[in-house]
Regions:
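Conserved acidic segment of CheY-like receiver
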Residues: 2-14, 18-22, 52
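Active-site residues of response regulator receiver
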Residues: 9, 55-56, 83
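Short hydrophobic/Thr-rich beta-strand motif most characteristic of the beta2 strand and flanking loop
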Residues: 27-35, 43
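Acidic catalytic/metal-coordinating carboxylates
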Residues: 36, 62-65
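The feature encodes the CheY-like receiver
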Residues: 59
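A short, hydrophobic beta-strand element within the central beta-sheet of small alpha/beta folds
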Residues: 76-86
Length: 147
C-alpha cells in the first residue's frame, strides 16, 4: 500500500525531523508538511491523505478542532498526535476515538515508527509516557473528558 502522509507542526525543525524518520518507512509514497491549518487546507485540495501527524499547538487553529475537520472530510484517515503537552487534562482529551496514536515530543524517534506501524494495522498506539500518565490520572482527580 502506498500512503500519503501530512505532517502538521508550526516548528520547521520538527517537520524536518519527522519527515526524515518517515522517509525511511516502507510504503510511504508522499509526505507533505504544513505549518498551519490554513496550509493543510491548501494541501488537502491537492492531495488526499491516509495519515496525519498533528501538533496540538498551531498558530491558527486548535489541534482538536483540526482533527474534527479532518475526520469530517476523511473519516477513514488515521490521526497521530505529536505533542509536547503532558498535562493530565490534555492526556485525558487525547484518549478519543478519532485519535489513533499519541507520541510525546519528549519520546525517542522509534516511538513515532511504532505508532505508524500500529496504526496502519488498525490498532491504537500510545507512547509509554502517555500510558504512564493516563494510568496515574485517576489518582490526581477529575479531568475534563470531552473533545
Amino acid at each position: 500500500m502506498s500512503l500519503n502522509v501530512a505532517i502538521i507542526d508550526d516548528h520547521p525543525l520538527v517537520l524536518e525531523g519527522l519527515k526524515s524518520l518517515l522517509i525511511q518507512t516502507e510504503g510511504i509514497e508522499n509526505i507533505c508538511t504544513a505549518q498551519s491549518g490554513l496550509q493543510l487546507n491548501d494541501l488537502m485540495t491537492l492531495h488526499s491523505f491516509h495519515l496525519y501527524i498533528i501538533d496540538l499547538d498551531l498558530p491558527d487553529i486548535d489541534g482538536f478542532e483540526l482533527i474534527h475537520q479532518i475526520k469530517q472530510k476523511s473519516p477513514e484517515a488515521k490521526i497521530i498526535i505529536s505533542t509536547m503537552h503532558e498535562e493530565i487534562w490534555i492526556v485525558n482529551k487525547l484518549k478519543h476515538p478519532d485519535i489513533d496514536a499519541v507520541v510525546f515530543k519528549s519520546s525517542a524517534g522509534e516511538y513515532i515508527q511504532k505508532a505508524l506501524q500500529t496504526v496502519l494495522k488498525g490498532k491504537k498506539y500510545y507512547c509509554p509516557q502517555f500510558q504512564k500518565l493516563y494510568k496515574e490520572k485517576d489518582k490526581i482527580g477529575h479531568t475534563p473528558d470531552t473533545l
